[in-house]
Every structure is written in structure tokens, then in C-alpha cells.
Amino acid sequence: MSDSNSRLVYSTETGRIDEPKAAPVRPKGDGVVRIQRQTSGRKGKGVCLITGVDLDDAELTKLAAELKKKCGCGGAVKDGVIEIQGDKRDLLKSLLEAKGMKVKLAGG
């Protein structure tokens, strides 16, 4: 009687019965890493957003840490996007191209 629509309603086992949650899957990019400068919603402070990097979360965090050290500034990883504080697009482009990534400067 195992049906994909049936689930356990009552059990004498202790504890809460939770279904395991699937890890969110990010869509694959087109192979181009884009660097965009953004100031909106940041009280006039500019940040560079790096999108399109096809790495898992642990490797993305390592890459962000390395870029922050080389740029000498702060940053964060949010929802698969690396944020680097300040307008360092040219330096970021050269660093990512040295790693063998195809990079485009997007936006204004």
C-alpha cells in the first residue's frame, strides 16, 4: 500500500515527523560571469554584484573570500550572488579572467 500520495498521519513514535526538504537547485548559467555595479537600496554606497558563477555554495564562499582579500574590502554571498563592496569592477574582472572564467561587465 505504498502510494506516493500517502503519508503517515499518526504514529506512536516520539517526536515530530517531518518530511526531508530538498536542497534548492540553482539554474545553470550560460557560462558567462557578469559583474554589475549597484547602488540602489544601499544608501548611495556602491557594491559590485558577481552573478553567473557555476559553483556550489562552499566553493562560492571560498571564491568570495579570496576576492575580498585581493580587493581589500568587505563583501558577502547572498542567494548565489557574490557582493563586493566598492566599485572594483576592473580588478574583479582581471582576477576572474586569471581563473579562466569568461567575464562581462554588465550594467552601468
Swiss-Prot record:
Alphabetical GO biological process terms: formation of translation preinitiation complex; regulation of translation; translation reinitiation
Keywords on record: Protein biosynthesis, Translation regulation
Regions annotated as coiled coil: none
Bias type Polar residues, positions: 1-14
Sample GO molecular function, one term: ribosomal small subunit binding
InterPro entries with a match to the protein in the record: DENR/SUI1_TIF (IPR050318), SUI1 (IPR001950), SUI1_arc_bac (IPR005872), SUI1_dom_sf (IPR036877)
Compositionally biased spans, kind Basic and acidic residues: 15-31
Keyword Chaperone annotated: no
A Pfam family the protein falls into: SUI1
Keyword Protein biosynthesis (UniProt): yes
Region (Disordered): 1-31
CDD domains reported in the protein's UniProt record: YciH_like (cd11567)
Family designation: Belongs to the SUI1 family.
Official protein name in the record: Uncharacterized protein YciH
